[in-house]
């Protein structure tokens, strides 16, 4: 690595609005990052994810443009 061209890499405390916090490394200058969502409260990781109605979208597309054979 060339000296003097890379940003400083600090130990950083990340705090989520849900109250979860963890330590990582980052180039954040003050060593603190506030996040709105993390793996503890994100719906994908908590299992509370809602499945979108993609079947209805496909049916509507086929109705408008015809189903290919």
UniProtKB/Swiss-Prot annotation:
Note describing how the cofactor binds: Binds 1 zinc ion per subunit.
One annotated Gene Ontology cellular component of this protein: ribosome
Annotated keywords: Metal-binding, Ribonucleoprotein, Ribosomal protein, RNA-binding, rRNA-binding, Zinc
Gene Ontology terms, MF aspect: metal ion binding; rRNA binding; structural constituent of ribosome
Cofactor: Zn(2+)
BP GO terms, sorted: translation
Binding of Zn(2+), residues: 16, 18, 38, 41
Alphabetized Pfam families for the sequence: Ribosomal_L31 (PF01197)
InterPro entries xref list: Ribosomal_bL28/bL31-like_sf, Ribosomal_bL31, Ribosomal_bL31_A, Ribosomal_bL31_sf
NCBIfam families: L31, PRK00019.1, PRK00528.1
PANTHER family reported in the protein's UniProt record: 50S RIBOSOMAL PROTEIN L31, CHLOROPLASTIC, LARGE RIBOSOMAL SUBUNIT PROTEIN BL31C
HAMAP family the UniProt entry points to: Ribosomal_bL31_1
Function recorded in the entry: Binds the 23S rRNA.
Assigned protein family: Belongs to the bacterial ribosomal protein bL31 family. Type A subfamily.
Quaternary assembly: Part of the 50S ribosomal subunit.
Name used for this protein in its record: Large ribosomal subunit protein bL31
Native organism: Thermobifida fusca (strain YX)
Gene name of the record: rpmE
